[in-house]
Swiss-Prot record:
Pfam families: His_biosynth
Molecular function GO terms recorded: 1-(5-phosphoribosyl)-5-[(5-phosphoribosylamino)methylideneamino]imidazole-4-carboxamide isomerase activity
Enzymatic reactions: 1-(5-phospho-beta-D-ribosyl)-5-[(5-phospho-beta-D-ribosylamino)methylideneamino]imidazole-4-carboxamide = 5-[(5-phospho-1-deoxy-D-ribulos-1-ylimino)methylamino]-1-(5-phospho-beta-D-ribosyl)imidazole-4-carboxamide
The protein's Enzyme Commission number: 5.3.1.16
Gene3D superfamilies hit by this protein: Aldolase class I (3.20.20.70)
UniProtKB keywords: Amino-acid biosynthesis, Cytoplasm, Histidine biosynthesis, Isomerase
Family: Belongs to the HisA/HisF family.
Recorded metabolic or biological pathway in which this protein acts: Amino-acid biosynthesis; L-histidine biosynthesis; L-histidine from 5-phospho-alpha-D-ribose 1-diphosphate: step 4/9
Source organism superkingdom: Bacteria
Name assigned to this protein: 1-(5-phosphoribosyl)-5-[(5-phosphoribosylamino)methylideneamino] imidazole-4-carboxamide isomerase
NCBIfam families assigned: 1-(5-phosphoribosyl)-5-[(5-phosphoribosylamino)methylideneamino]imidazole-4-carboxamide isomerase
Active site as annotated: 8 (proton acceptor), 129 (proton donor)
Length: 241
C-alpha cells in the first residue's frame, strides 16, 4: 500500500490546515522543494501536492512551488487544487506531474473528466471531499446535495486512475480517519480509493492496511508526519507489510 506524504501549498509555503480553514494554517516548511526532497530521501514512492490557494481561486496559483518540487525529486507527484480545465491538466502533465486530481470540476463538469481520461489514460484521479457524506467543492467552501458514493459511481466507466476520498471533518485534526466510510465507498467501486483526512497514528495506518482488500490503494498523511506523531520510516514499514 502506498503512503502519500502531503505537501499543501499556501502562499508558496508548505502548510497544514484544520478542517480546510485557510485562516487556520500552520507553516511547517517555507521550502516545499526541500520538504519533497526529505520525503524522497526517507523512501517515499509518491508525493501528494495540493495548491490550496488554487483550490479557492479556481486556477493554479502556486505554480513556482510545484515546479520547484518537480525539479527537486525524481518521484511521481500527484497534484490537485484549482485544476478546472483541459489546458491546466495538459500543462501540468506536460511539466512532469504524474497524476492530476480533479475535484470541483468533477461535480460541475463530469464530461471534462471523461475527456481528460481519454487524453491522459491512467493519469487522472478524482478528489471527493466529503462533509457528512456529501460532496464539498470550491475549496470546501460549498457543500453540495450529491453524496460521495453517487459522485464516485458516475466515473466507474471513465477510466479514472483513483478516487481520493477526504473526510473534511477529520482533516488536520488528528482524530483518526473515517475508515468505515472510505472502505464502504471502496467496496462499491472498481476504481482504487486513497484514504485522506485525520490519520494520526501508526495504529490508524495498521487499520487502513488491514482493509486493503476493500480496494484501498493508499493513504495520504500530512500533519501527523510533520509534528512527529508518525515516524515516516515506521509508517512505510507498516504499509509495506
Amino acid at each position: 500500500m502506498i503512503l502519500f506524504p502531503a505537501i499543501d501549498l499556501k502562499d508558496g509555503q508548505c502548510v497544514r490546515l484544520r478542517k480546510g480553514e485557510m485562516d487556520q494554517a500552520t507553516v511547517f516548511n517555507d521550502s516545499p522543494a526541500d520538504q519533497a526532497a526529505a520525503f524522497a530521501l526517507a523512501g517515499c514512492r509518491w508525493i501528494h501536492v495540493v495548491d490550496l490557494n488554487g483550490a479557492f481561486a479556481g486556477r493554479p496559483v502556486n505554480a513556482p512551488a510545484v515546479e520547484a518540487i518537480l525539479a527537486a525529486v525524481d518521484l511521481p507527484v500527484q497534484l490537485g487544487g484549482g485544476i478546472r480545465d483541459l489546458a491546466a491538466i495538459d500543462l501540468w502533465l506536460d511539466k512532469g506531474v504524474r497524476r492530476v486530481i480533479l475535484g470541483t470540476v468533477a461535480l460541475r463538469d463530469p464530461q471534462l473528466v471523461r475527456e481528460a481520461c481519454k487524453r491522459h489514460p491512467g493519469r487522472i484521479a478524482v478528489g471527493i471531499d466529503a462533509r457528512g457524506g456529501m460532496v464539498a467543492v470550491e475549496g470546501w467552501a460549498e457543500t453540495s446535495a450529491v453524496s460521495a458514493l453517487d459522485l464516485a459511481l458516475r466515473f466507474e466507466d471513465a477510466g479514472v486512475a483513483a478516487i481520493v476520498h477526504t473526510d473534511i471533518d477529520r482533516d488536520g485534526l488528528l482524530a483518526g480517519p473515517n475508515l468505515d466510510a472510505t472502505a464502504a465507498l471502496a467496496e462499491r467501486l472498481t476504481t482504487p480509493v486513497i484514504v485522506s483526512g485525520g490519520v494520526a497514528s501508526l495504529d490508524d495506518l495498521r487499520a487502513i492496511r488491514a482493509r486493503a482488500a476493500a480496494g484501498l490503494e493508499g493513504v495520504i498523511s500530512g500533519r501527523a508526519l510533520y509534528d512527529g506523531r508518525i515516524d515516516l520510516a515506521e509508517a512505510l514499514a507498516v504499509l509495506a507489510d
